[in-house]
Every structure is written in C-alpha cells, then in structure tokens.
Amino acid sequence: MSLVIMVRTRLTTGGIAEPVVADTAKSLAKLGHRVILLAWDRTGKFETTSTTEWGTIWRYQEECALNSPVLFARKLPGFLWWSTWQILAFHKLEKNIILHYHDLDTLPGGVFTSKIIEVPLVYDCHENYPGLVKGAVSNTVATALHKFEAMLLGSCTGIISAGPANYARINNMLESGTKAPFAASEEEAHEVMKMVHQDFLNSKLTRVGNVKRLDSYPEHKIENREKRDKFRILYIGVLEKHPSRGIIETALTVSKMKDVQFDIGGFGTLVPNLKKIDAKFENVNYMGPIHPDNVPLETINCDVVLMALDPTNINNKLSAPNKLFEAMSAGVPIITCKELLMGQLVEREEIGLTFPWGRWDRLRAIIMNMMFDKQMCSEMGKRSRRLAEKTHNWERCEERIESLYRFVKRKPNPEVA
C-alpha cells in the first residue's frame, strides 16, 4: 500500500483534523495505507507532531486569523512551500506516495509538488471555493479563481467532491475547462442527487459528502436521549458574519420566547457579540468551541438542529453542510431555509421545517409549531435517521474512496486519466 500525504490549511478545535478529513484518513488507514496530514495550525499553539488512530499530524505553526483573507493570502505561500519540502523529504525515503490535497487553497501546491516527484494527486474539493469567497473578494477575483481551478483539474489523477452541486460543477469543468459555468444549476444538482451509488465508482471523479459514521450516533443513545423542560435548539459550527448563518438573528428571536433554549457552539468573529447576548438573555447559551468527539452527543440531546444560510451566496444556496447530516445521524429534525437546495431536501423527505431567509417571524412560528407538536418532531427525527441508515452514511463513502484510490493507482498519469 501507499504512503498518503494529505495537506490542509486548517485544523479544528483541539488542533485536530476536521471530521470529514479524519474520516477519510481513517478509511484510507483501514485499507492499509499509511497516512500523514500536513496541516496549518493557525493558532500556533499545538504540538508540532501528534499521533492519531489513523496516522500522524504534522503542524505548520504560524498564527493567522481565520477571518483575515488578506493575511491568509500573504501567508499561504509559506505553508505551501513548507508542505512541499516535507513531501520532498518523505520522497527520499518512500517512492510509493499518493498526494491528497484538500480544497483550492492548497491545490496549486499539490499540482507543483506532484509534477516534481511524479506521483499521483488526489484533489479533495469540499466546497465551491470561488463561490464561498465571492462577496469577500471582487467578482473578477472570484471568476479568476474559478478559471484557475478549472485549469488545475487536468493535473489531478483523482477528484473527490462533496455535495451534489459541487460534483456537477466539477464535472462541468472537466468537460468544458475554463468555459464551464461558475456554479452548477439547481437542475444539475438534482440530477446528481438521482445518481445511484455505482455511478460514483471506478472513475476520476467521485462524491464523498459530509455524511457521518453512524457508530458515532448509536441507536441506544438516541432512544435514551435526555429529557428536558425546555425546547433545545442547537447550532455548532462556524461563527462568522459572512456568509451569514443567521445566528445573531436567531438568538435575538429566541431571547423573546419562553421555554426555548438556543445553545451555540463554535468559534469565529461573532463570539464577542454572542457572549454579550448570552450575558443578557437566560435562554441563549454560548458553549464555546466544541470538540468534534462531543458533537454527536450534543446533537442527540437536542430537539432540533438549526442550519440557516443566506441564499444570496451561491455556495450556501447549493451546499449540503455538516449540520444536515449530523441531524440525520442523530435522529433529530432540522430547521433550515426554503430557498436552499438543502431546504428542498428537508421538505421533500419531511425531516424538518423551513422558513424564508430573513423572515425571523416565520422562524419563531416554526419553533412554536415544533414545541407544541412533539409527535411531529419525533416522526421527523425517525425519518431522518432512516434516511441516514439507507443512503447518507459513511459506509458508502468509504467504498467510493477505496474505488477512487484503485483508479488512481491504475492511472498515475493525469493526462491519461
């Protein structure tokens, strides 16, 4: 088997790999590969190296605020050069290497390094990166990033995409290059959602989403979830102003309601404001950063997961985020926005309720509806868990990863892949 070297520009709470990165690494280790993650510790506080159940994390220790795109852009080349030098050192000892680079911010380094040492490159595209930064940067810059990504795809031996819209977007770029549209349409995303599991096997492009390992959400804990007096709404994730997730607005909405509690976990620029709201209102609780290992139990022990997203951001509108699959796996309903692709799934499968973005009075009405109809919530939660067990679980993704790596081993030269 191979030495798989992953590269990622960030870590999560505790200086460890994000869940989807860790799950991918676990699956690769299970297949017999040795895994090293070269990651940027943007706090500069954690150990240089540490051992995990799936391999080793090597950290590039350089402080860089998560919400400072200009500083990030200035410091990114240093991380990419550091990663390349580490890989070159490993290559002196080990020739059977596969590079696995996460997201567009690392991909230029991946293409450069893979060409130098002539090894396969897997591009793990978690999101429409140009779509994500659009708004924070000019349209010209976002479009340039899109075309740059399309150019680099030809140098990748294998590609992993997350949600259906991103899969369709990348497929368009593989077919049309720089002439491909900036984002996939909703119709294209729906067509990907209709694809069967076998369609994602034995090809250069596969789909591995933010789905969860169901053994982290055991059935016995779901059946014996905590009983509470208050209706508990949960959000654990990114706490940034842009693109908005409606966290402040939800907190202010809930603050005026009786017998409702809004628990918020995570880190970001909204934290100072959330701490002020926490201090002012008894039923809004900022829990601080939550370790990924604790997310399943927190989710199981809530009544509903909130995942509101501003649909004016194209990445938001067409995404299939972590929160959706955490709620599914935990067997709890989800509240989201009806304009989102995720909202359409929630409505169609009847696993939660939706409201129009910005209509916080409608959010209040939905919360009231759920509070006083526990039977409805219970049925939504059961449907949600069944959907996770049937389709949206890590076991299927693991098979796709195995298939992609077999493809990559057979096709080490991207030009013939």
Predicted regions and their residues:
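Short hydrophobic beta-strand element within catalytic cores of glycosyltransferases
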Residues: V304-M307, E326-T336
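Membrane-proximal helix-turn-helix segments that form the acceptor-binding/catalytic region
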Residues: D23-K26, T84-H91, P108, F112-I116, ...
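N-terminal strand-loop element at the rim of the active site
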Residues: V7-T12, S27-G78, N166-N171, K179, ...
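Nucleotide-activated donor-binding/catalytic signature segment of Leloir-type glycosyltransferases, i.e.
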Residues: K230, K258-V260, P272-L297, N301-V304
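A short, glycine/small-residue-rich beta-strand->loop->alpha-helix junction that serves as a flexible
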Residues: M6-D23, G44-F46, E240-R245
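A short, well-ordered alpha-helix in the C-terminal region of glycosyltransferases
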Residues: R362-A365, N369, M376-T391, R400-S403
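Conserved donor-binding/catalytic core segment of Leloir-type glycosyltransferases
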Residues: V4, N210-K212, S216, R225-R245, ...
